[in-house]
Amino acid sequence: MKVKDFDFYLPEELIAQHPMEKRDEARLLVLDKETGEIEHKIFKDILDYLTPNDCLVLNNTRVLPARLIGAKEETGGKMEFLLLKRKEKDVWETLVKPGKRAQIGARFIFGNGELKAEVIGMGEEGSRIVKFYYEGIFEEILDQLGQMPLPPYIKEKLDDKEMYQTVYSKEEGSAAAPTAGLHFTEELLKKIKEKGVKLAFLTLHVGLGTFRPVKVEDIQEHVMHSEYYKMDKETAEIINDTKEKGGRVIAVGTTSCRTLETIGDIEGKVREQSGWTDIFIYPGYKYKVVDALITNFHLPQSTLLMLVSALAGRDNIMNAYNVAVEKEYRFFSFGDAMFIK
């Protein structure tokens, strides 16, 4: 299959620039993956589509305020750092701009000097390996000095950092939010549990590779970035129990979906596990664990659009996307949601 098979026209004004004030009042396009039938709802109506046998699988990762603005120690020249991946305790793979000022041995200062950094190596694709120096707790310093690493298509500044976190976020380590989860409120989750639906949590730390364009013409040649995941015993038991009782495993977001499909065996069973995944799901892939998916609307020609096409069929998805554009749904990270059932 070719990348151009996943293209669609998206007017720029449909790219949501800020989150909804009330998370669960975003719009919801419901797509039947077998028939292609479409319904238009509000996100909190998701409750009507869930049954007591179902299990929602949510990614509890938390976004690090991983964008740091600092200065070169010698010259005072302004620098921008974006933390990509923790290599060891105080060593990170980092994108540094401008790169020419970030040679090995270069030192940088942030805030009033409470955080310092040195480039100690070169990483993949122009990234740098950076060691940080500080007193106290790194996460607390980052919380004070760092900004949210919003996707490149969001041009407006975020007033409240928590609006780019899910209400159940817990495990710090992501460079981007698992955005399907942004639509849930504490109250909606409570109602879902009261209905008898099981909630199961796993972790996948979202890397910036999630925004990386597919640069090859033939999608099978694309290589995904690897991302760290973990699933505990309790979550594995809930999912396996759901399968045994004939319930649906509903992934909240493509990150939960990719983690489940990484861990699942050919019988659709999962187990406690952690590791790195570079799974790339595109049409032709047979889902082992995931029965349904709650997700946002994705970029044209993106790997995530290919993932949803593998679940619902390319024609059904491309038709639904064209309808969403026509009906002026909001797209991407802060946009509306889709439930593929």
Swiss-Prot record:
Pfam families in the cross-refs: Queuosine_synth (PF02547)
Assigned GO CC terms: cytoplasm
EC top class, as a word: transferase
UniProt keyword list: Cytoplasm, Queuosine biosynthesis, S-adenosyl-L-methionine, Transferase
Molecular function GO labels: S-adenosylmethionine:tRNA ribosyltransferase-isomerase activity
SUPFAM superfamilies xrefs: QueA-like
Enzyme Commission number(s): 2.4.99.17
Location (main, coarse): cytoplasm
Physiological role: Transfers and isomerizes the ribose moiety from AdoMet to the 7-aminomethyl group of 7-deazaguanine (preQ1-tRNA) to give epoxyqueuosine (oQ-tRNA).
Protein name: S-adenosylmethionine:tRNA ribosyltransferase-isomerase
Species of provenance: Clostridium botulinum (strain Loch Maree / Type A3)
Organismal lineage: Bacteria, Bacillati, Bacillota, Clostridia, Eubacteriales
Originating gene: queA
